[in-house]
């Protein structure tokens, strides 16, 4: 196991354990050949695994993850960064990971150690490459922070590595080739390349391919299981259900919610749900269903979007696939607006007007003959120097201090931000460094009292209205988590004034080229100078 633990004694506090651990992980980012759906191809892996190594920690711990870039395959990108999706990065904005926002890419044969105090954060997260479309080539994995005092702990008996469920869409073609298709003048409909299969915990099947054994989740009758379901796809959403079993939703994107029984739920790219499943049926095998929804599915003959299954296997049942029809989910589907945050419910500022109101709309425009996605008619282009470096080294504190296509909106510290995402096609919007309250969802009734709270929301139809507090200094990316969409320009960043960067600016290093003063972070000199 490529991990270790160091215990650090802390002063006991109401919400902090007496001992916190430093959780040490070693990530070798390397090219390996794998065949998760029966088709062998080279990928970008974490320690040679699909999905990547599971990271686990407890509330109050610190993650220390040493990333070594061993990539050599010229058919794929050979630099990398890693984003720790869902982690707030309070006081550690420089460890967030998106290339050219908080760091330069880690070049070949270099190492970088991400060090992230978790503070009081808990829940189901994941990690993935955040350089171009690299995570499509396989660099992604689960991350779980356990809470010894979880408010839902009495509701389940089992919550461990065996109950983490990773959903992925899978491509047989390397991401740089897919990017060329996206950036083609022939892509007049702005369609994402269609995947070849869907995976559950690293196993799937494509049309005409071999019958790869299904992933199996083992249960014992009478026990209650917390499944942590993660959508780590590039484009696809999945409709998750388990034959003959109800699902009780207790968490969305790391945030505990009031228990809500459903029969199925749709999960969009980047989202996570925890559900409780009671093993209360006859000891047998049952289908875990996750049919995939993807635009243009019929254009790829390899893809059967309905053929995304795993098996719920009861102790004592034969080791075999279920004999029932695979079918599709029936019953009550999750409606997002029926979710209610369990702890400190209520949108920041209540129903009063927000201190700052943002109107955001994903649109389209043609740039150099290529149709691109935009946020508010601006197509994002990554700067040559990371946004965080500009803030720290050049004291950038106004919108005008950044290039127009960097699309940066400076927010006042500790103010309530209202963001209205206008209607359009389905886009799962992700905000780094925060969660938001969804005060109005897809044409529903406004709810400022106990709305859902999460970090990825589906925007479509009639749009959504969000609330969050700008209380976490950093340059935080906002983007659609459909890979094609954000690669084609639909993202922006929301920094705070540099005076608020307390911990980041406490670490100094020499002046970087192109800046007027020391960048004040250990990240830039060793990484950017090699880029």
From Swiss-Prot:
GO terms for molecular function: copper ion binding; hydroquinone:oxygen oxidoreductase activity. It is found in: Secreted. Disulfide bonds join 104-528. Glycans are attached at residues 66, 109, 186, 231, 280, 395. Cu cation 3 binds at residues 130, 432, 479. Residues 1-19 form the signal peptide. This is Laccase-4. It comes from Thanatephorus cucumeris (Black scurf of potato). The gene is LCC4.
């Amino acid at each position: 196991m490529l991990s270790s633990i160091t215990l650090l004694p802390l002063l006991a506090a109401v919400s902090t354990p007496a001992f916190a651990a430093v959780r040490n992980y070693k990530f070798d980012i390397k090219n390996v050949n794998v065949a998760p759906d029966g088709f062998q191809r080279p990928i970008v892996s974490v320690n040679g695994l699909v999905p990547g190594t599971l990271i686990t920690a407890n509330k109050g711990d610190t993650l220390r993850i040493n990333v070594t870039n061993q990539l050599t395959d010229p058919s794929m990108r050979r630099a990398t960064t890693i984003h720790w999706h869902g982690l707030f990065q309070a006081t550690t904005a420089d460890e967030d990971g998106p290339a050219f926002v908080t760091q330069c890419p880690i070049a070949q044969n270099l190492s970088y150690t991400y060090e992230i105090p978790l503070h009081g954060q808990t829940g189901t997260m994941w990690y993935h490459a955040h350089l171009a479309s690299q995570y499509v080539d396989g660099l992604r994995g689960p991350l779980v922070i356990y809470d010894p005092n979880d408010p839902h702990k009495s509701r389940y008996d089992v919550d461990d590595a065996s109950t983490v469920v990773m959903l992925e869409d899978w491509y047989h073609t390397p991401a740089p080739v897919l990017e060329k298709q996206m950036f083609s003048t022939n892509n007049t409909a702005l369609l994402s390349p269609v995947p070849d299969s869907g995976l559950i915990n690293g196993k799937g099947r494509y049309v005409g391919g071999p019958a790869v054994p299904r992933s199996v989740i083992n249960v014992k009758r009478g026990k209650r299981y917390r499944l942590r379901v993660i959508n780590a796809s590039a484009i696809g959403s999945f409709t998750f259900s388990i034959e003959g079993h109800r699902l009780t939703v207790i968490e969305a994107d790391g945030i505990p919610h009031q228990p809500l029984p459903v029969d199925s739920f749709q999960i969009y790219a980047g989202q996570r749900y925890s559900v409780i499943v009671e093993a209360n049926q006859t000891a047998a095998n049952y289908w875990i269903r996750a049919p995939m929804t993807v635009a243009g599915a019929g254009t790829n003959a390899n893809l059967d979007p309905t053929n995304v299954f795993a098996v719920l296997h009861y102790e004592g049942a034969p080791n075999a696939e279920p004999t029932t029809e695979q079918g599709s989910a029936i019953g009550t589907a999750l409606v997002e607006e029926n979710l209610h945050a369990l702890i400190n419910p209520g949108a920041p500022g209540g129903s009063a007007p927000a201190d700052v109101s943002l109107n955001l709309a994903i649109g389209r425009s043609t740039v150099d003959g290529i149709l691109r996605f935009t946020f508010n008619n601006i197509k994002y282009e990554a700067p040559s120097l990371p946004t965080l470096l500009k803030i720290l080294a050049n004291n950038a504190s106004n919108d005008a201090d950044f290039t127009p296509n960097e699309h940066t909106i400076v927010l006042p510290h500790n103010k309530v931000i209202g963001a209205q995402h206008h209607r359009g096609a389905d886009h799962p919007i992700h905000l780094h460094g925060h969660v938001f309250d969804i005060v109005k969802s897809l044409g529903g009734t406004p709810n400022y009292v106990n709305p859902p709270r999460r970090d990825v929301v589906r925007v479509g139809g009639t749009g959504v209205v969000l609330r969050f507090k700008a209380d976490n200094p950093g340059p935080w990316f906002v983007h659609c988590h459909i890979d094609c969409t954000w690669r084609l320009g639909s993202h922006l960043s929301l920094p705070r004034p540099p005076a608020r960067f307390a911990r980041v600016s406490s670490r100094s290093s020499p002046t970087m080229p192109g800046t007027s003063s020391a960048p004040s972070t250990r990240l830039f000199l060793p990484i950017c100078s090699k880029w």
